[in-house]
Amino acid sequence: MVLKQYNGIQYQDLGEGELILFLHGLFLDKNSTQIFFEKDSQISNFKRIYLDLPGMGDSAIIEEPSSNAIFKKLVAFIDHIIGEKSFIVYGHSYGGYLAQAIAHHYQNQVSAVFLTCPVVIADDNLRITEKHKNEFGDEMKITTNDAFFSDFEAMNVMINETSWLAYQELILPGLQKANQVFIGKLQKNSYGLSFEKELDHFGSETKIQVVLGRYDHVVGYKQQLALFVQKENADITLLSSAGHNIMIDQPGTIYSLFNKLINNKNQ
């Protein structure tokens, strides 16, 4: 698979059909979306674009470390690569924040939005978050990447061999590549979009699926519920045994809900 580049953004495109754009979370990269979703055979009839956000994965940093500048970069990418075609957008956490901005900006093009644990309030001092917890499986023997196991426990609810392997596959590559200085400046200075209060203004026909974790200590779930419950086109799912790394805690449910959205969005 050949890695492509446009205007400093590294991306991978696969397949043909209606397009799905995948946006990963902060400090992560396209491994967290591509490796996860490519295991789902039901997306084979869609064209998929997995990209690295600026300063993450293989994408270059940008001069201005702000969400407004990153969004502007994504708009230029979409206008050039996707054009005026209809598309679906997926976003996790910070990628979910940007996905909402994209759905707002391209109201006549975005047919569906799938959000997992999305940021809806950039200022973490204003978020209502939850207390994290762990649900332990069988005793584990850690033989690789033991320095990251504490982060794994801090971010995942389900603690077992399967979820630990998934964490190393989906999360670790991004953590190791992320430009810490760039992201630090982004978080400190200009993490919020200037039009944050307008993010929930999607197209009237845009289908929405939001999936939240009950033990999400990063973005919580209560404010997302309050925001999206007002939308007639939105389905909201709250998972009890899940935290912020929801795709690792409950992969089967994520696949099921994602497939339901992309296959039934026109009904």
Regions found by a protein language model. Give the residues of each.
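Conserved HGGG/HGGXW glycine-rich cap/lid loop of the alpha/beta-hydrolase fold
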Residues: 9-60
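Conserved loop-alpha-helix segment in the C-terminal half of the alpha/beta-hydrolase fold
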Residues: 38-41, 207-242, 248
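Active-site loop/oxyanion-hole signature of alpha/beta-hydrolase fold enzymes
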Residues: 49-90
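Residue in the alpha/beta-hydrolase core beta-strand immediately N-terminal to the catalytic nucleophile
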Residues: 87-88, 111-114
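Gly/Ala-rich beta-loop-alpha elbow adjacent to hydrolase catalytic centers
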Residues: 91-95, 99
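Flexible "cap/lid" loop of the alpha/beta hydrolase fold
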Residues: 100, 104, 113-143
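Conserved alpha/beta-hydrolase catalytic His-Asp/Glu region
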Residues: 124-126, 144-202
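Catalytic active-site module of serine/aspartate enzymes centered on a nucleophile-bearing elbow/loop
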Residues: 234-267
